[in-house]
Amino acid sequence: LEVGAREVHTSVETEPGGAARDVAVRAALEAAGVAWVATGSPYAVTPGRVRNASGDGYRVFTPFLRAWRTHGWRGPAVEPGPLALANAPSDASAWDTVDAALAACPIELPPAGEEAALARWEEFQSKELARYDENRDLPAVDGTSRLSAYLKFGVLHPRTLLADLAGRQGDGAQRFITELAWREFYADVLHHHPGSLASDLNPLEVAYDEPDARFEAWREGRTGYPIVDAGMRQLLASGWIHNRVRMITASFLTKDLHVWWPHGAEHFLAHLIDGDLASNSHGWQWVAGTGTDAAPYFRVFNPISQGERFDPDGEYVRRWIPELAHLAGAAAHRPWQVPDGYAHGYPVRIVDHAAERVEALARYERARLSRSDRARRQL
């Protein structure tokens, strides 16, 4: 109103809280005689548009991927010409101030802005895309795009990426398109099932434990399992964590410590610079075995073998755990087998993975049988 605006243009917000906020903002604007115009969304295909033959949303990724590709998407928006900006009132400087608590960020953030995002995209295409399919699971290798924060905040649109990838048939390019589709899939699922933001899409009613001192050890990277601790320390120090390690750390919390996934998802969101609500919640549910397209409940990530497989030389572990920097090669994943493994203060394991795996499977099996029994009684 201060600048005489007649219309306010935004992109469509599809996450539950943002969508509710937009309804309130639209009502307030219209009451003031200002039109609210929502155009587009931060997705190649706006959530809710890809539907199955029955008109419903998909709950399994592979058929969604096929339908998403068939649906297609528009090309990137044409860059506008010179824009005439409104003259701001004299006291408008306060509009763009940043709260001091937010300005004093404890981590180093990636360069901001579209120019930086496009530069990173060009660098990824030229250096890492061809090997993306083989390197994306290796946390010690700079093999991922690191574009997630730019996508999250709308600095870069997925249609720009997809347009640049059109016609590229290599394994790396195709895998990258598939990973973009996972982001679209999770947003679509959340659109159709907003309650899945903080609760199980497919409830199993597993007997979980309340967060305790072991949960704090997990949050701080003091579990005694190197790959888990390296990931959690990377998260705290950089605001980012490698996707493979996100799965390993999530499995450890839900299957080894038996803590319900929303506790971990909340911790991730508090620290991730790319904290996407849909991808975060449904990624956690995939690991926990209670979401859409979920991993089978009996799949329990072994934090030792996962570390040895995806960080075979221990480089990632040594990078984030200085207490293990003296251990060469794969020995960094098993400090308990090395005479001086604990010489620099690395903590001992807080649980026995083998025993907790058995316990997790027993809890999930009891939940499965209980659900089956209830279903039979309802027949």
Residue ranges: model-predicted function:
Residues 55-204, 310-311, 315-379:
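Glycine/tryptophan-enriched, flexible segments
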Residues 9, 215, 344-347:
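Short coil/turn segments at secondary-structure junctions
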Residues 1-111, 285, 304:
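Beta-rich, aromatic/charged-enriched effector core domains that present basic-aromatic interfaces
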Residues 13-14, 135, 219-220:
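A generic structural signal for short
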Residues 138, 142-321:
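Active-site-proximal binding-pocket segments
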